[in-house]
């Protein structure tokens, strides 16, 4: 079934990406395709080391012809991960993302508005500073940071950036280009009035939590619906030092009572027309990106690495994102109703099973007829 899964990556298209990134420059014998299949096997087969990747593939040597590879020596795979550009894997991810959007009827989100809705967040991936001395974050701690955009149509990642742990969320947020009318949901780590002013001038909406020490003046008070747990709905202008120059636009401050946690949440947005309860629901839906990070770390190999160089770590993270995209694509295509953890576990057990992959995806527990007569084995104990 692994070979059928790899048909999501046409070889001709893959080779074009190899040429674009010059991934096989000075390469001898070990192809970029073999490297990619090996690293994808690391994720889907849950291999913990180069030895397990090499040994796991070697134990299936007779079945690797269908994959177009041979089992690589661990030293060869380790060298390729250290020296071949990680940008190839980023390009594979973006290409697969387009294919997923084109081939799957994405499940519509619960909101009626037509604006594109994305969540923006980041997550630390801790590293041992003694082994990864390039990943300085704090004096005794190493880390890289995965910044992610999650599209709420289908809850697929739409873009990702991997940076050093020291890089701020706001710095990365400035790199993203959003289409006008897009609604960006983020947390207080992205509170930057210069960024909010930039987005507002470009016609991009944001929904976030307001800082407790924000200074503002109320321009207008809107009517509130207490039944929807809305306590206040105010049109405001920032009046703190420098804030009014960075973001001179009218904003909206909404106080919402969360009866589940019995706390008051204060939202800040530049969308002046949506209902206050809708703004609160939009922010609540941001938990999807936190769930994505949790699933990524729990089900794929992203907390321990098979290489120690920055290039090898990035290749493994991008491969994990590719694997996650495959799994979400399979969930959306399947009629079975897989949970992610069950899909990961059963797929790992059946990677080299001879069966129609898409039939298995819809009916994983179907008992197939045995196509030939079997003879009972007998032991001569005399």
Give the location of each predicted region.
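Single, function-defining residue in the core of a domain
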Residues: 1-52, 56, 84, 91-95, ...
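Blade-loop segments of beta-propeller domains
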Residues: 60, 64-68
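Major-groove recognition helix of helix-turn-helix-like DNA-binding domains
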Residues: 67-84
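Active-site phosphate-binding and catalytic loops of NTP-dependent enzymes
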Residues: 104-107
């Amino acid at each position: 079934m692994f070979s059928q899964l790899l048909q999501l990556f046409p070889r001709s298209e893959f080779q074009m990406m190899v040429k674009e990134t010059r991934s096989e420059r000075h390469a001898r014998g070990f192809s970029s395709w073999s490297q990619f299949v090996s690293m994808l096997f690391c994720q889907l087969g849950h291999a913990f080391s180069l030895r397990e990747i090499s040994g796991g593939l070697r134990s299936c040597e007779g079945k690797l012809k269908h994959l177009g590879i041979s089992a690589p020596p661990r030293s060869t795979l380790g060298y390729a991960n250290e020296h071949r550009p990680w940008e190839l894997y980023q390009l594979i991810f973006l290409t697969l993302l387009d294919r997923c959007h084109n081939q799957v009827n994405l499940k519509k989100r619960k909101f009626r508005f037509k604006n594109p809705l994305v969540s923006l967040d980041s997550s630390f991936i801790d590293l041992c500073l003694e082994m990864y001395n390039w990943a300085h974050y704090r004096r005794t701690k190493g880390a890289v940071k995965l910044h992610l955009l999650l599209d709420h149509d289908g809850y697929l990642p739409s873009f990702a950036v991997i940076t050093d742990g020291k890089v701020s969320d706001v710095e990365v947020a400035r790199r993203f280009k959003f289409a006008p009318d897009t609604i960006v949901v983020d947390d207080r780590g992205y509170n930057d009035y210069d960024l909010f002013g930039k987005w507002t001038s470009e016609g991009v909406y944001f929904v976030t939590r307001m800082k407790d020490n924000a200074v503002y003046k109320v321009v207008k008070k809107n009517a509130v619906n207490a039944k929807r747990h809305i306590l206040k709905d105010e049109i405001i202008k920032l009046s703190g030092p420098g804030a009014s120059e960075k973001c001179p636009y009218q904003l909206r401050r909404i106080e919402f009572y969360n009866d589940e946690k019995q706390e008051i949440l204060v939202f800040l947005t530049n969308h002046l027309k949506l209902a206050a309860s809708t703004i609160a629901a939009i922010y609540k839906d941001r938990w999807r990106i936190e769930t994505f990070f949790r699933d990524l770390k729990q089900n794929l190999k992203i907390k321990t690495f098979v290489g120690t160089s920055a290039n090898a770590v990035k290749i493994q993270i991008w491969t994990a994102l590719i694997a996650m995209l495959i799994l979400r694509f399979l969930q959306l295509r399947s009629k079975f109703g897989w949970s992610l953890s069950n899909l990961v576990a059963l797929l790992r057990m059946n990677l080299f099973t001879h069966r129609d992959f898409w039939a298995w995806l819809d009916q994983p527990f179907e008992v197939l007829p045995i196509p030939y007569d079997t003879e009972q084995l007998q032991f001569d104990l005399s």
